[in-house]
From Swiss-Prot:
Its EC number is 3.6.5.-. It is an enzyme of class 3 (hydrolase). Mg(2+) binds at E71. This is Tubulin alpha-5 chain.
Length: 450
């Protein structure tokens, strides 16, 4: 089996995790108590969904996941919520005091005390796997736990499980909407370690997802639940081929191979289509070309970043539902002829497609309509640098005055770490610039042959 362990860190990671596991359970027909009436082979671990769930002898399905937070309130909601019987109590780890939006507390003082316990739980889950494939890590980099403890855990996972893939789903600070004053510090410090210790990081940002909810789902005032349900659809689409048998399966390591041209250039944009409310879905056909065009629209990007300002290096299109390869090839062919979707000149093919016949599932009473087919795109575009330059700019404004720095130094950080992390990000922006730059003069006429 190719198992995957999910690690949810901090409030954002846990709440996204709740939505994801709720959706997985619905997709597989697993009840909130972990029983699965449709599973005829009790205790036999050869079903495809066993990548994400382990089965007990009694036929109960337990998520291969760990939830960690430095303060108990959010995890207590899981402990008392609908799915309280689904998780093993040892998988829900909470501390006593929170990281107070401070990277240094999450990484050095408070986080240090809990990290060994987390790794111990992860080790137990890993020992339970026959062929561990990798980790999905969920966190936000604006707060203290997600950024600090998130980085610490990733660093330790690199040491303990060097060769295993680590995919991060990371919520980055939005341009306008801010939840903490020190977000720029936490994000820069945390990205510094994401660069080193994740293989693929998918950037999400709340503002972009708010706009999608408002525009496409007609929700006037979206809540975090609305946002998380949309995020969970993306994560579910990425992992369908690991959990169901499909026509063209995409493995977790395949994402890496196809999307990451250079180790540092691994920050992805994601988009999903159709995002549509039940009232509208009834009147639209939503064919393969339509949804394929939709995922390339700047407005459907899940991070505030305009792909037209950059060039694509690679895209991964994951279709699910009633889709045949012929339709996909035609749709991709159309996209290639579009002048708005530009690829770098050194990557002429640029598309990786996966198809899975399992149609998308929706949460009952949720906002999304039940549709026959959907597509999720993860793309590597040089425009992602916009996200970093925005945060770097805010970082510089604060750091020039050394504002709030004493809180970090007081928790045992050195000021040098700030400048080191900031220089690393400056280098990253430069990397993106170089990757997007045109090739030599002699290559100009070669770009047209595909």
């Amino acid at each position: 089996m190719r198992e995957i362990i999910s690690i949810h860190i901090g409030q954002a990671g846990i709440q996204v995790g709740n939505s994801c596991w709720e959706l997985y359970c619905l997709e597989h027909g697993i009840q909130p108590d972990g029983m699965m009436p449709s599973d005829t082979t009790v205790g036999v671990a050869h079903d495809a969904f066993n990548t994400f769930f382990s089965e007990t002898g009694a036929g109960k399905h337990v998520p291969r996941a760990v939830f960690v937070d430095l303060e108990p309130t959010v995890i207590d909601e899981v402990r008392t919520g609908t799915y309280r019987q689904l998780f093993h109590p040892e998988q829900l780890i909470s501390g006593k005091e929170d990281a107070a939006n401070n990277f240094a507390r999450g990484h050095y003082t408070v986080g240090k005390e809990i990290v060994d316990l987390c790794l111990d739980r992860v080790r137990k889950l890993a020992d339970n796997c026959t062929g561990l494939q990798g980790f999905l890590v969920f966190n936000a980099v604006g707060g203290g736990t997600g950024s600090g403890l998130g980085s610490l855990l990733l660093e330790r996972l690199s040491v303990d499980y060097g060769k295993k893939s680590k995919l991060g789903f990371t919520i980055y600070p939005s341009p306008q909407v801010s939840t903490a004053v020190v977000e720029p510090y936490n994000s820069v410090l945390s990205t510094h370690s994401l660069l080193e210790h994740t293989d693929v990081a998918v950037l999400l940002d709340n503002e972009a997802i708010y706009d999608i909810c408002r525009r496409s789902l007609d929700i006037e005032r979206p809540t975090y639940t609305n946002l998380n349900r949309l995020i969970s659809q993306i994560i579910s689409s990425l992992t369908t081929s690991l959990r169901f048998d499909g026509a063209i399966n995409v493995d977790i390591t395949e994402f890496q191979t196809n999307l990451v041209p250079y180790p540092r250039i691994h920050f992805m944009l994601s988009s999903y289509a159709p995002v549509i409310s039940a009232a509208k879905a009834y009147h639209e056909q939503l064919s393969v070309p339509e949804i394929t065009n939709a995922v390339f629209e700047p407005a459907s990007m899940m991070a505030k970043c305009d792909p037209r300002h950059g060039k694509y290096m690679a895209c991964c299109l994951m279709y699910r539902g009633d889709v045949v390869p012929k339709d996909v090839n035609a749709a991709v062919g159309t996209i290639k002829t579009k002048r708005t979707v530009q690829f770098v000149d050194w990557c002429p093919t640029g598309f990786k497609c996966g198809i899975n016949y399992q149609p998308p599932t929706v949460v009952p009473g949720g906002d999304l309509a039940k549709v026959q087919r959907a597509v999720c795109m993860i793309s590597n575009n040089t425009a992602v640098a916009e996200v970093f330059s925005r945060i770097d700019h805010k970082f510089d404004l604060m750091y020039a005055k050394r504002a709030f720095v004493h809180w970090y130094v007081g928790e045992g950080m050195e000021e040098g770490e700030f400048s080191e992390a900031r220089e690393d990000l400056a280098a990253l922006e430069k990397d993106y610039e170089e990757v997007g730059a045109e090739g030599g003069d002699d290559e100009e006429d070669e770009g047209e042959d595909y």
